[in-house]
Amino acid sequence: KRYTVEDTIPYLRLLKSGICQLDEKHFSKSIAFQDINYQLALDEDRDLIFNQFANFLNSFDPSISIEFSYINQLGRNEEMKSAIQIPDKKDGFDDIRLEFREMLKSQIVKGNNGLKKSKYVTFTVEADNLEQATSKLERLEIDILSSLKSMGVRAESLNGEERLKILHDVLNPNKTFEFSYKDLKKKESTKTYIVPDEFNFTPSRYFKFGKFIGAASHFQILASELSDRMLAEFLDIDDNINISFHIKAIDQSEAIKMVKRKNTDIDKMKIEENKKAVRSGYDMDILPSDLITYGEDVKSLLKDLQTRDERMFVVSIVFMNFAKTVQKLDNTISQISSIANKHNCKLKRLDHTQEQGLISVLPLGINKIEIDRGLTSSSTAVFMPFTTEELFINSSNSLYYGLNALSHNLIMADRKKLKNPNGLILGTPGSGKSFSAKREMANAILVTDDDVIICDPEGEYGNLVRQFNGEVIKVSSKSKDYLNPLDINMNYGDGDAPLKDKANFIMSMLELVVGGSGLTAEEKSVIDRCLPKIYEKYFDNPTPDNMPILQDLYDMLKGQEEKVGKKLATEMEIYVSGSLNVFNHRSNVDLNKKLLCFDIKELGSQLKKIGMLVIQDQVWNKVSQNRGSKATRYYIDEFHLLLKDEQTASYSVEIWKRFRKWGGIPTGITQNVKDLLMSKEIENIFDNTDFVLMLNQASGDREILARKLKISLPQLRYVTNSNEGEGLLFFGNTIVPFLDKFPKDTILYQKMTTKPEEVR
């Protein structure tokens, strides 16, 4: 029989369920698993992950073979490509969408060139028939998934189609996989759909497959101690790399017997050396240093096996690289070799056994390489498969947050997927804080249907807002843009009692007016009595002309019998007919725009807090209008100002607690982290915040934040004297170091930068 391309791939059948029958007696199944934070974790967390991984290896008995496969593929990131396809909306901003898509493409190239990194564990059992194999594999699968889950690792079992796609993509790097079990003809092998056009294993050090040249090597461990960074360093190479670890446990009593035999051999050698010394007439206690070291190693290994819960494994490590030219291939291999040498190990080409090397690297669970090495659980666990968690949510509402500083993968996330989408953006002046906020706003406008509202105390968002035809509302005593603090709509607050919720806001505002220790119980009662009366006309006939203004409340309070009514009216006077009467008008601005910016830069210091409170209330109006139909994103710059006063602080906490129910996504932005952290309400804010974008921090603030958010020392480096646009992103339970170098030659950059010399 002629030997065909398919004969190289040595399995009998790969079933739809994901079970692969390798030969008469062996069956395997595969699980794909994701990365977790290891490199930047707290020391105790790192130790925990390491021990959990070693225990995970210990859980396999000698009847099971395990293969860990790490596959890095260039240009295979379909998921990433689809995530950056921002669809046009024909709303006048499609030129910016095009620019944003191009920017994302260039970020991928700048990052790791769309390198797809995958991790798999394949487990193989021996069984007499498929039925027996299925029950064994299913039990194992449940155990492996739960072990990985307990380490915080997301993992999922692969079905037949998914396993075939992985094999196809390794063997056909430039082709698209097209296969469905429905189309499989009777007696046709699934191999037909995964093999390349040709295999040529004639050369001794290379092999050809399709249009590519590959090389398989085995990894020789010569070092006495290994680093848990080594595997990560190999996988950091931005090139096509396949690495497989074949691991099989040795029966514990066998392992102990084996080590004891070694110990006996060494003792015999020592006796021989002693006799030699006596015959030659020198001191019999002087032994060759190699023999002493070796003897100590064997004794400590025996102790580990007997008392330290260590197990012995037989491990084979195979590498496979490929490229279109021998020169490119040799470059990558020499890169790998130099990392191996640095760690006192060696990458050795599998001369004349390239075919066996290729088979051993495929995630099938087959090891054709007879070169192995005995390692304990801890030595095997040193090949730690985890480095950094990725944050990549493939959703139509995902926004761009830069590149992962460790893996250089795109960070795409959708805050709406969080339990609490509320957020904070924190950073010192010049850290890129405003820029990050603007980038998120612009991205949200381009990608989602959400409304965006900004409270702008420094007047720095106007450029961006005008770019997107938004409305900039200048709130100041000189401006002719008016906001009525008494505005209400029928959905206001919880919707069932709009006035009750509105009363809360009016009380908060009047507490600011009165100052001191706030309103007395008597004053609150009088206000509460007046409010339904001033809204009567509007509720009977809800037209804009019937909306009450502060003047109506002032008149009503003045007309009350109690002295406190008149006292309150007097205290309100300056805001009604005096020099601070900017809020005593009906609203005359278009609040229905998709993008709204309240510019309060010229609102005097006396009115700033009231201004921020009134804006917050207008946002409530908007959120309650949008409820159920779309999200409302609200950005509050200089957020620490709102948390300084009890009244504005408690109102802000209310927003933080209740907004999400109605589709509101508030974001506080501040450079004054110290002031923010001093607020009594900060615990409530942090407890209800699942998104924190942290840029460079001042040293004192850094320490407080590290305690509050459990940041490890290696993570802290990313917010210590860091460059503009670099920092840490907290997204639910995920912490990712990021960097964002936004291209300066774009329309958006010009509209987002706050550097005077760059604004055109």
Predicted regions span which residues?
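Conserved lysine of the Walker
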Residues: 433
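Conserved P-loop NTPase
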Residues: 709-760
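Hydrophobic anchor at the beta1->P-loop junction of P-loop NTPases
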Residues: 425
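Post-Walker A helix-loop "phosphate-sensing" segment adjacent to the P-loop in P-loop NTPases
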Residues: 443-453
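Extended, folded cores of ATP/NTP-driven motor/assembly subunits in large transport
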Residues: 1-388
